[in-house]
């Protein structure tokens, strides 16, 4: 396979959104791309997921001060979270109770674990340097690739051997700032607008217009996580957040009502996965992780 090893002004891609859309590339009008592909050959959709998810985790880290991770599929997040310690129940339903977890690994365990069916084959974004614990967690899941500001040597070695050596590993310059004006072409017509630079943090929550002024810090944190997640979710979009992680995301629905139902149903499933009957299901030995996820979803839905 062809691998990109260094930063460049442009990268030629195999094809665009669909195999018939050729030629395809990503490029900069000025300067070099702020990325280095350390392994694999990411495609058009991979890069869309990578760049959108990176912005999400970067903003989560800036807003909360905690390591953040996102699980992206088809240019919307399936999960997003910060590195808050997991209790034993969540470790079990996320299938990470056999692994040592760093704060960054915990963030990805939460992001991946919230909606495991949607996260199957995801693209991962990490706010901090990918460590060995996070790489080991990524290595056991079906995934297309990862973007992070850096990788420890141990983590990079693990990821380079994933998917028979073709796993996509992207390093991004965390100091990169895009131009304040962005462009998009549709049907040969160019749209121009200022970037969405709104800063979503607790400074937005200083004025509480209700009789009760009680607003717990945990609730503020979760509200900010929801807002940042929705900033990078295709509209219409709805997000339920609890304890530092999205537990149900509805994306790209024409109806806000249907979108709310979709996100709410995912949140319901997240809660029901913690029921003792689900946690104690008798699994056959060596069942595939995807088969286990699908079975749990069907069992709960019935």
Predicted regions and their residues:
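Active-site loops and adjacent core secondary-structure elements that bind or stabilize anionic groups
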Residues: 1-204, 219-237
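Glycine- and Gly-Pro-enriched alpha-helical subdomains that act as flexible
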Residues: 78-116, 247-302
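Substrate-contacting helices/loops that form the catalytic groove of nucleic-acid
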Residues: 180-215, 272-301
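Short, surface-exposed loop/turn motifs that are enriched in glycine and acidic residues
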Residues: 42-43, 212-215, 249-253
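A cytosolic small-molecule/anion-sensing beta-strand core signal
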Residues: 242
């Amino acid at each position: 396979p062809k691998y990109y090893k260094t930063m460049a002004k442009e990268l030629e891609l195999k094809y665009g959104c669909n195999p018939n859309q050729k030629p395809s590339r990503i490029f900069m009008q000025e300067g070099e791309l702020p990325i280095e592909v350390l392994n694999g050959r990411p495609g058009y959709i991979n890069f869309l997921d990578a760049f959108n998810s990176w912005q999400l985790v970067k903003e989560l880290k800036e807003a909360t001060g905690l390591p953040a991770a996102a699980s992206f599929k088809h240019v919307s997040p399936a999960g997003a979270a910060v590195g808050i310690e997991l209790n034993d129940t969540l470790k079990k339903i996320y299938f990470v109770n056999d692994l040592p977890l760093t704060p960054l690994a915990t963030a990805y365990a939460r992001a991946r674990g919230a909606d495991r069916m949607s996260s199957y084959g995801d693209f991962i974004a990490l706010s901090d340097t990918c460590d060995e614990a996070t790489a080991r967690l990524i290595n056991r899941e079906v995934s297309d690739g990862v973007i992070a500001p850096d990788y420890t040597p141990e983590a990079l070695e693990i990821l380079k051997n994933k998917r028979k050596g073709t796993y996509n590993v992207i390093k991004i310059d965390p100091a990169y700032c895009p131009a304040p004006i962005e462009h998009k072409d549709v049907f040969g017509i160019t749209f121009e607008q200022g970037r969405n630079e709104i800063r979503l943090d607790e400074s937005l929550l200083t004025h509480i217009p209700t009789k009760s002024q009680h607003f717990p810090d945990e609730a503020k944190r979760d509200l900010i996580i929801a807002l940042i997640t929705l900033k990078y979710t295709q509209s219409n979009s709805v997000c339920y957040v609890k304890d530092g992680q999205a537990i149900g995301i509805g994306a790209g629905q024409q109806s806000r009502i249907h979108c709310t139902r979709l996100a709410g149903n995912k949140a319901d499933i997240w809660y029901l996965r913690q029921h003792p009957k689900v946690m104690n299901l008798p699994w056959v030995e060596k069942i595939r992780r995807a088969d286990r996820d699908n079975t749990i979803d069907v069992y709960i839905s019935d």
